[in-house]
Amino acid sequence: MKVALGLVLGLVVGGVTLRLLLPTLAAPVLQRTNHRGAPIATAAGLVVVLAVLGAEAALGVVEAAGFDPLGGAVGRRLVVLATVGFGLLGFIDDLLGAGESGGFRGHLGALAHGRLTSGGVKLFGGAALALAGLLFGCAAAA
């Protein structure tokens, strides 16, 4: 039941967030041309970040009223940490990335040649977030 409630809440908040953000995602600064020449929104991950924050805010209000519909506050905090952290790293990559090195292999290749790309920052930042989440989760479980 908790999984179904979480899924429904996430879908509703995500759908509303997407509808609200569609005009923003169409802004030229957030558009790139893909390999087929079609324009794509680069910062679509913002929808996920804002949906998670919105759902978490709604759950916070419900919990403040004395209900605990989902439980597992530590796990939810880790999800928020990972989502916001990866979302921020992705947004920085979208805004600052020059498109010179694409994909995991391209960013590692650039690093091997002494260049740190915005995707490389995302790579190392993601690893740091994963480690922080692991340490936080282990400390909370103890």
Predicted regions and their residues:
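"…together with the soluble PPM/PP2C metallo-phosphatase catalytic core" -> "…together
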Residues: 1-142
